[in-house]
Amino acid sequence: GESERFENVLTELFGLEPDAVGALRLVASTGSVIGMSRTYNSPDGKAAGTFGQGLPAIRSSEMISGTEPRRIIFLSEDSDSRANVGCVNGSSEDVQISLAMRNARGELLETRTMALGPYSNNQINRIFRDYQPVKGYVDVSAGSQSAFYYCYGSMLDNATSDPTTILPQVPSADTTFIPAAALAAGLAGAFFSTDVDLNNAGATSLTYRLLWLPRGVDNSNPVQSQQFSLAAGAG
């Protein structure tokens, strides 16, 4: 099917000027439309190109419903990085969203509340500012069964403001893949490496390994890491 891309969509479609921030709602005649967005930083003079993060268009079936919590991991606040958490209300009713901030040991640091009106959205910048240096995560939840919303995290490099999108997760018994990892040179002097953050969202301790799957080869018998453990609620 046909695709269409809108560059700098807030200016192209809505004629907005700086400083405009918010969310977009996609309304279509059928359910067959899919979408993707990229929000990016353009450094002065663009000598270094752009730094940005992608966010997919979230379907109604992927929104967070009711009181079941979701976890946003891989958040940090220190001299190198900062973390933001944003939420959007997908319904015509007000919603109160609780954001329980925890450190990597699972200890509760603070619970903040985000109140959103119908179809409203907001973002808490540098959510762990008062607890730096810290690595942690945020559990988002609502107190009403009628709640219908979505939250995301964003980790930014303090030197470049290069952001990384972090989507909310729930534990699953399914096999889990991290579909890309790198330790390799790129174009124009770039060099890519991969950080991984793992979290135990269950009620019992667990052990795990990571398996290395090199690109373009048969990985039926992959190289395995040593075994690690995570206590219940830790990350």
Where are the predicted features?
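Gly/Pro-rich, tryptophan- and cysteine-flecked surface segments typical
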Residues: 1-235
